[in-house]
Amino acid sequence: MTYLLALDQGTSSSRSIVFDREGRIVAIAQKELTQIYPRPGWVEHDPMEIWHSQLATARDVLAKAKLQPADIHAIGITNQRETTLLWNRKTGQPVHHAIVWQDRRAEPMCAQLRDQGMAATIQEKTGLVIDAYFSGTKLRWLLDNVPGARAQAERGELAFGTVDSWLMWQLTGGKVHVTDVSNASRTMLFNVHRNEWDADLLKALDIPAALMPSVQPSSSHFADTDAALLGRALPIGGVAGDQQSALFGQACFAAGMAKNTYGTGCFLLMHTGGECQPSHNGLLVTSAAQTSATPQYAMEGSVFVGGAVVQWLRDGLKAIKGSAEVQSLAESVPDAGGVMMVPAFTGLGAPYWDADARGTITGLTRGTTVAHIARAALESIAYQSAALLQAMSRDAVAAGGTPVAELRVDGGASVNDLLMQFQADLLGIPVVRPEVIETTALGAAYLAGLSTGVYSDARQLSKLWKVERRFMPTMGRAQAEESMARWERAVRQATAT
């Protein structure tokens, strides 16, 4: 039997999943990751905790699956994107905590870049908007604020990487400093047209080129692991940022196919094939997972606070004791009772891109209960995703394509039937949940399997993808449009300054 090991390093946890060659889950191991909040708007992770937790889950999952290292054909890696690490090449020690994608400390630097007229150049070269979300300004902050970092970087003593690079450095005992195109495309330093680091952007952000990892296609041989770590040297055959990996795991291989991952944030991606189509509706252009040197692209919309709104209900508002309660509480009322929540706790992402927006709850009356607020919180995830898909469809039509015909879904919150049905109602298209919702890890496994001969091509992978449930719209379009209009009014209140 052939098995593939996916290392899935996420924002809230490190996980490892073993899949068989049919894409079925054999075993899962998980360890929570400590969230560090030094100041309001700052979010960090301990790089050594990232590494040790990921290695521990890899060992745990082999034990759970009752497999030997020799049973694993290849390893695939998928990871939280944009999170920025800087470490010493000689010692392998990080010079600072990892700055997480949610972190907003680099916003003043982004404002300077906008004032310098860099917005159009950065969007044209990278497909991204100037935002503290991406790695480039986080890296610049580290160079400017960690004592001695800039001098060390200019001497070639430091290495920059996103989480995938950091894990591969550790997995190989410091032998490789590499990333894949999908992760590189999220740095605001990578030219998505030329598939290489952009010298002009590195210069504009005052980042030494010696810091940067080499870049490979997502499905390729990156390295072999140090045999001492897992009992045998195993090939790392696939690497992709979590959202591009999920797009691949959802078998969205053709232009116009789209998926939404409902995790800490929500991430909606539509494959655009070999065309690097610009967005005119506030969306990002990004590199999709590549299986060869030929570029592939996707359009992306990012929601900063998706499932995290449920965590806030539990930990911040103390409205629920556990995340599992939210569906039953929300279902105890027929609707949100006029309550609308905009969870802009860290600003708003696409298609609004307002770093100064703050969370609001509107429509409160004496009759409002905690159940109405819970339902409004859940519905806010669907509203944000619907705004993204509508923007995406407008871009697709403008480029001569057609609106998205169905939305494939995955991630932890996709198991919530109430949320999925409301999503279908707002969109007016089927929302399709696959049998395996661990599509982020599955995508990494597929990429590794492709490069090592387990699979022959994307056609074979498409046949493995199976539907668990299809949610059909039941709400009339007039009602859905009125609901979206109410959402946009609430957003305007959240973004008012």
UniProtKB/Swiss-Prot annotation:
EC number of this enzyme: 2.7.1.30
Family membership: Belongs to the FGGY kinase family.
Broad EC category: transferase
Tagged with keyword Transmembrane: no
Protein residues bound to ADP: T11, R15, T264, G307, G412, N416
Cited InterPro entries: ATPase_NBD, Carb_kinase_FGGY, Carb_kinase_FGGY_CS, FGGY_C, FGGY_N, Glycerol_kin
Entry keyword annotation includes Metal-binding: no
Binding site for sn-glycerol 3-phosphate: T11, R81, E82, Y133, D242
Binding positions for ATP per the UniProt entry: T11, S12, S13, T264, G307, Q311, G412
GO terms for cellular component: cytosol
NCBIfam families, per the entry: glycerol_kin, PRK00047.1
Record keywords, A-Z: ATP-binding, Glycerol metabolism, Kinase, Nucleotide-binding, Transferase
Protein role: Key enzyme in the regulation of glycerol uptake and metabolism. Catalyzes the phosphorylation of glycerol to yield sn-glycerol 3-phosphate.
Source organism per UniProt: Variovorax paradoxus (strain S110)
Coiled coil: none
Superkingdom assignment: Bacteria
Binding-site residues, glycerol: R81, E82, Y133, D242, Q243
Swiss-Prot/TrEMBL GO biological process terms: glycerol catabolic process; glycerol metabolic process; glycerol-3-phosphate metabolic process
Reactions mediated catalytically: glycerol + ATP = sn-glycerol 3-phosphate + ADP + H(+)
Protein name per Swiss-Prot or TrEMBL: Glycerol kinase
MF annotations from Gene Ontology: ATP binding; glycerol kinase activity
Known pathway: Polyol metabolism; glycerol degradation via glycerol kinase pathway; sn-glycerol 3-phosphate from glycerol: step 1/1
Protein's gene: glpK
Gene3D superfamilies noted in UniProt: 3.30.420.40
